[in-house]
Amino acid sequence: MRILETLCIFAPEILLDMEQVEFELELLEEARDFLKSLTKEVRGKIGRNIRRVQKGERDPELFKKLGSSEIWEFRTLFNKKCYRLFAFWDREANTLVVATHGIVKKTQKTPVREISKAEKLRILYFENKNND
């Protein structure tokens, strides 16, 4: 059910496209709140880009590892604005990508504080998972 709830946040038409994907996506609360704060059009574009990556498209303009950290970013350009959704892999739970939070990017480089925030949320995620 988690997958369907996640897809509904982006755009209902994505539910119609349930082909085999290479990974599942889980949104942490901050990522969900970020997406809900965006317009339907922006959410739809982000969702379509994520779906392309889930189906195996390898394009650093859509999904890119950030330096030497364990953090990746889903990248979307819409109406001259750059949207970023930070994420990491949890390979213990099949193949799962966990999105931590998102930003509307305003600078050339991804802010270090946003990468640090994603890294902290990643650590918390695994601590909580291991304590369950």
Regions found by a protein language model. Give the residues of each.
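Basic, Lys/Arg-enriched alpha-helical interface segments
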Residues: M1-C82, R91-V97, V104-D132
